[in-house]
From Swiss-Prot:
Biological processes annotated in GO: amino sugar catabolic process; N-acetylmuramic acid catabolic process; peptidoglycan turnover
Keyword Lyase applies: yes
Pfam families, per database record: GKRP_SIS_N (PF22645)
Family stated for the protein in its record: Belongs to the GCKR-like family. MurNAc-6-P etherase subfamily.
Full protein name: N-acetylmuramic acid 6-phosphate etherase
Recorded catalytic activity of this chain's protein: N-acetyl-D-muramate 6-phosphate + H2O = N-acetyl-D-glucosamine 6-phosphate + (R)-lactate
Entry's EC annotation: 4.2.1.126
GO molecular function, one term: carbohydrate derivative binding
Domain (SIS): residue spans on this chain: 54-217
Family annotation (PANTHER family): GLUCOKINASE REGULATORY PROTEIN
Pathways per UniProt: Amino-sugar metabolism; N-acetylmuramate degradation
Subunit-level organization: Homodimer.
This protein's UniProt keywords: Carbohydrate metabolism, Lyase
Length: 294
């Protein structure tokens, strides 16, 4: 029942929200937001377990699939679409599904989140299999669309995890691993796009970033698999080579072009003073880890 969910409770500190000054509203929001990172911190051990499972999926050429409705679904898609430019992944490696389809990203689709079968259809459409990991996201922890997706994922042998913002969430029963970040009452009663949404975003940031580090997408703290899809990212790529190797910008730019805009290869070429082909071979043997290639 909704009334039993902490995310649906009224916040005792904001009973007079409509009477507050603009500054008081903003201060109140900021005060509540400061509690979110602390709530996430309590779940780090559970998040770590999820990351390990995702890394295993990636190592087996499986995928990470997020499913959610409303804000939760949008956050999953947001995290997924940032992976290709940041980590050089293809657009199938991390995917996000929202109840009602992509049109629901910008406009609510009535009733979609209440239909378990829609998630099964979405996951069937990509040929979900036992190598994949499905993460169901629901602030309330009870969304039927997410439950349906987790049930189907389990039926095909995929790994499953859930992210919710209430303890003892319903969706936790349908996932092997559970992250339950208890964010409590919102300043605007039931508006889980606020603290709950922020908590979900923080957890998704952790999962995707730590998982990509785990499969060699990062050297030191540099995103060496960045895709140079625009002028800003071309410049960033060259700067990454400078930071990783200590050479001048000109030398970095030269090796960037010699390496056919492959930042990892350019770094290996500079540090080992080798040719492009040899750098690629070393990276292949090292399974993409720059540090191991060196």
């Amino acid at each position: 029942m909704l009334e039993n969910l902490s995310t649906e409770h009224r916040n005792e500190k904001t009973m007079n929200l409509d009477e507050m000054s603009i500054k008081e509203v903003l201060q109140s929001m900021n005060e509540e937001d400061r509690t979110v990172a602390l709530a996430v911190e309590k779940e780090i051990e559970h998040i770590e377990k999820v990351v390990r499972v995702v890394i295993q999926s990636f190592e087996e050429e499986g995928r990470l699939i997020y499913i959610g409705a409303g804000t939760s679904g949008r956050l999953g898609i947001l995290d997924a679409v940032e992976c290709p430019p940041t980590f050089g992944t293809d657009d199938k490696m991390v995917q996000g599904f929202i109840a009602g389809g992509l049109k629901a990203f910008t406009k609510a689709v009535e009733g979609a989140e209440d239909r378990e079968e829609l998630a099964e259809e979405d996951l069937k459409s990509i040929g979900l299999n036992e190598k994949d990991t499905v993460i169901g996201i629901a602030a309330s922890g009870r969304t039927p669309y997410v439950i349906g997706g987790l049930k189907y994922a389990h039926s095909v042998g995929a790994s499953t995890a859930s992210i919710s913002c209430n303890k003892n969430a319903e969706i936790s029963k349908y996932a092997k691993l559970n992250v339950e970040v208890e964010t409590g009452a919102e300043i605007l009663t039931g508006s889980t796009r606020l603290k709950a949404g922020t908590a979900q975003k923080l957890v998704l940031n952790m999962i995707s970033t730590a998982s990509m580090i785990g499969v060699g997408k990062v050297y030191k703290n540099l995103m060496v698999d960045v895709q140079s899809t625009n002028e800003k990212l071309v410049e960033r790529s060259k700067r990454i080579i400078v930071e990783a190797t200590g050479v001048s910008y000109e030398v970095a730019a030269e090796h960037y072009e010699k390496a056919e805009r492959n930042v990892k290869a350019a770094i290996v070429m500079v540090l080992l003073q080798c040719e492009y082909g040899e750098a690629l071979e070393k990276l292949k043997v090292a399974k993409g880890f720059v540090k191991k290639a060196l």
